[in-house]
A protein has these predicted regions:
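Short helix-loop-beta connector
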Residues: 79-83, 134-136
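Short glycine-rich phosphate-binding loop at a beta-alpha junction
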Residues: 82-91
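N-terminal amphipathic/basic-hydrophobic helices that include classical n-h-c signal peptides
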Residues: 1-20
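PRPP-dependent phosphoribosyltransferase catalytic core
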Residues: 17-32, 156-203
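Active-site-facing substrate-recognition patch
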Residues: 15-80
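Solvent-exposed alpha-helices and their adjacent loops that cap or buttress functional pockets
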Residues: 47, 130-134, 161-162, 182
Length: 203
């Protein structure tokens, strides 16, 4: 039989191992982002701004390892009681699908929603694709890279206008351009990494 102290030691050991695992996943994902997603040069961003730093997460989020790591690290930041995750196509597509699968194998129910940039031009003319939950449900928005936050906020607005509650946006990378947009739209913003984390990462 275990004593109370032994039980506490086991619990503490499990937490320590879990923390180490999460940190190892973070390091691996950071290295993948630096190796596959980051470029240095002269670029025009989707916001129209010029930058010497460019990040395209798709070679990471659409890879088996990268998608699994993103799902593992992002699901812990999905708002409690969220029944779905959603985001603007195309950057958020692999993220919402990865989270939905991760949730299923973790005994949770979180569906994936894809927000179109424009309504479908035929049929039901949907702007939100997926197994849509009842109105009033909580949905967390996911994004790969945020610069001004406009893409994520577009998804937030579409979901809110469709009757869903959106309080949080979770991104892989925050370029740290402007955070005023989050407060203005009453959004809690969380990112796994800052741009400087990737720039400084050595591989």
């Amino acid at each position: 039989m275990f004593s109370g102290n032994q039980g506490a030691e086991i619990d503490g050991g499990m937490v320590e191992n879990l923390n180490k695992t999460m940190e190892n996943h973070r390091k691996t994902l950071l290295h993948l982002l630096k190796e596959r997603a980051y470029k240095n040069g002269k670029f025009t961003l989707s916001s129209g701004k010029e930058s010497e730093h460019y990040i395209n997460c798709k070679p990471v989020t659409l890879s088996c390892e990268g998608n699994a790591l993103c799902s593992h690290l992002m699901i812990v930041h999905v708002e409690d009681n969220s029944v779905a995750v959603g985001g603007l196509t195309l950057g958020a597509d692999p993220l919402v699908c990865g989270i939905a699968q991760k949730a299923y194998y973790s005994g949770k129910h979180i569906d994936a929603l894809i927000v179109r940039k424009n309504p479908k031009g035929y049929g039901t003319k949907e702007v939100i694709e997926g197994n849509k939950p009842p109105k009033g449900s909580i949905v967390t928005v996911l994004e790969d890279v945020t610069t001004t936050g406009s893409s994520a906020i577009k998804a937030v607005n579409v979901l809110r206008e469709s009757g869903y509650i959106v309080n949080r946006v979770v991104a892989i990378v925050d370029r740290q351009e402007d955070h005023k947009i989050w407060d203005a739209n009453k959004i809690e913003f969380i990112s796994l990494f800052k741009l400087e984390d990737i720039v400084k990462c050595e591989i």
